């Protein structure tokens, strides 16, 4: 997925109140950018890190800038979790995610479960519907190892239970992790951060939910899903 405009490089001054980040630009000006990542952002919110911003000239916006990328541990990382759904849709349509090919239609945000909306619903070609829940991952905890989540997510565990229910109903369900960095080969649940989520992920996989992970190539011009990763669920 290409960025529609050129990104602006700066240095992170601080991230605060979840939605805001102060960034020093190359000319010394400090601007406030919208931070669309409301999570813990573990490892990618350290003051001084290089960051990239997009700029909007929409007069209705309170903040002109949006925090898009960050460089940590020598690697560019996508900072927008909500981009993961669009990346997944683009990759499915392009046939990049081989496990999710062969369907006639793709819909987003379809209601299911208990007041939930599935990220992607694949249908058609005389196949059972395929319910795909997408989770964004940015956190590297060891060389080549990405982990999720970086904070407790009861909502994420709820989604896994709902995916398992779809399998029980005779349909297909997939938990898809989009890792917005290129330096990881393995995806693991962060057992110490959220043991309930880790256990629920293993239980749902045992019940037939497919667990996939894909890494991205990240640059100041685009973020693109490009290769599968190994998933390790054992403790």
Curated annotation (Swiss-Prot):
It comes from the Bacteria. GO terms for molecular function: DNA binding. InterPro entries: SfsA, SfsA_C, SfsA_N. Belongs to the SfsA family. NCBIfam families: sfsA. This is Sugar fermentation stimulation protein homolog.
